[in-house]
């Protein structure tokens, strides 16, 4: 499954809805949106939640001009929070669906095994035992050139994002200054030239 966010040069990108209408289910376009899905891992089932938007230059960056950039920055903060809220909602809905399906399956199994008490199944699933991993996709890094806290890092901490993936940076100085973590959030720089144009395994 493929997830895509808008970059700073993607002028062809009209809107997430128009892109979805064009591509169908082949790609999930995230622009202030979030989603979640259940996957199977070697350790068992896990819920992966994705949210994303373009983000923007942060205040304090040498290229940030308040007169022209502040309103765009504020808008991208709203889109980021909308994506994180939608991620959380998608996780809740997925948990409800998993619980409902499990109850139906358990009911069928119990009816089939009414003659053998040793084969009785529990009436509910411990949905809270399924771990959730929250991944936020941004084009811009969530901080300025000094790696100073920003509105984006505030949201990352508030919504307990596990991994933040971003790009935009294409110079060695930036490559060297990016931290591996911000608080409890893992940071992944995935600019193509930084990765030598190779795929990056996140988890």
PLM region descriptions:
Residues 1, 46, 130-133:
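Short coil/turn segments at beta-strand junctions that form active-site/ligand-binding loops
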Residues 8-16, 36-37, 57-61, 141-149, ...:
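Active-site environment of divalent metal-dependent phosphoester hydrolases
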Residues 44-127, 200-202:
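Binuclear metal-dependent hydrolase catalytic cores centered on His/Asp/Glu-rich metal-binding motifs
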